[in-house]
A protein has these predicted regions:
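Membrane helical hairpin/interfacial module
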Residues: 2-83, 88-103, 112
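Membrane-interface helix-boundary motifs at transmembrane edges
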Residues: 43-53, 112-120, 178-187
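Hydrophobic alpha-helical segments with transmembrane-like composition
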Residues: 69-179
Length: 187
């Protein structure tokens, strides 16, 4: 909506860079908060029990709400009767599905490493690097209409690769903060 002369100014380029940091910072913060929550509730990440089921159900609710807001109609029948292109729209990923999926990945990593903080931070870092590395490859893949939006930046605003990587980097940063904070911030 801005004139090209405005977009060519140096302050606009600075604004554009800062504006581009919003989504990664939001996902990074979600990962940071997830790790802090993990530290407080570590026991609930160790076993397949009621607490874990409640956590996963809450995360799946966030993912479901992300899909719900994309439905073109409130009628499932009308949605199903749309064309193949029309069906892809409800499956496009937005920030809610990205956060939910990232939290599911983080929860799975916590279960696999049995709640050990250092291992969880390392697993989060390596998985984040995997998400970043696979992004160009996954973006070029073509698959079924319901799978393609998971990885295609053309079909989704927030495909899983690379965006979940920012959440996992946030989790790693929270662990790192826990390691260095006592040194720099004496209580």
């Amino acid at each position: 909506y801005l004139l090209p002369v405005v977009k060519n100014t140096s302050w606009y380029r600075i604004h554009d860079v800062l504006h581009g940091m919003t989504a990664p910072a939001f996902l990074f913060s979600a990962g940071f908060a997830a790790f802090l929550s993990f530290q407080r509730k570590r026991e609930s990440y160790l076993h397949f029990d009621r607490r874990l089921v409640v956590r996963v159900r809450r995360i799946l609710f966030v993912v479901a709400m992300g899909y719900f807001v994309h439905l073109p109609y409130l009628s499932l029948r009308k949605t199903i009767l749309r064309t193949q292109q029309g069906l892809a729209d409800p499956f496009a990923l937005d920030i809610l599905q990205c956060i939910g999926t990232g939290l599911l990945v983080f929860t799975l990593l916590a279960l696999v490493v049995r709640g050990r903080e250092t291992r969880l931070a390392l697993a989060s870092l390596l998985t984040a690097l995997l998400f970043f590395t696979l992004a160009p490859v996954m973006a070029g893949l073509h698959g079924p209409w319901f799978v393609e939006p998971l990885f295609s930046p053309v079909r989704s605003l927030f495909p899983l690769t690379p965006w979940v990587g920012f959440l996992l980097l946030g989790a790693t940063a929270a662990w790192l903060y826990g390691q260095v904070a006592p040194v720099f911030f004496l209580s």
